[in-house]
């Protein structure tokens, strides 16, 4: 759903910003 898509995008952004991926 939309909420799941937003959550997934948020995780990608957090991963990129943290430099852990």
UniProtKB/Swiss-Prot annotation:
Has antibacterial activity against the Gram-positive bacterium S.aureus ATCC 25923 (MIC=56 uM) and the Gram-negative bacterium E.coli ATCC 25726 (MIC=28 uM). Disulfide bonds join 15-21. It holds the Pfam family Antimicrobial22. The keyword Disulfide bond applies. The keyword Disulfide bond applies. GO terms for biological process: defense response to Gram-negative bacterium; defense response to Gram-positive bacterium. Expressed by the skin glands. GO terms for cellular component: extracellular region. It is found in: Secreted. InterPro entries: Nigrocin. Keywords: Amphibian defense peptide, Antibiotic, Antimicrobial, Disulfide bond, Secreted. This is Nigrocin-2HSa. It comes from Odorrana hosii. Belongs to the frog skin active peptide (FSAP) family. Brevinin subfamily.
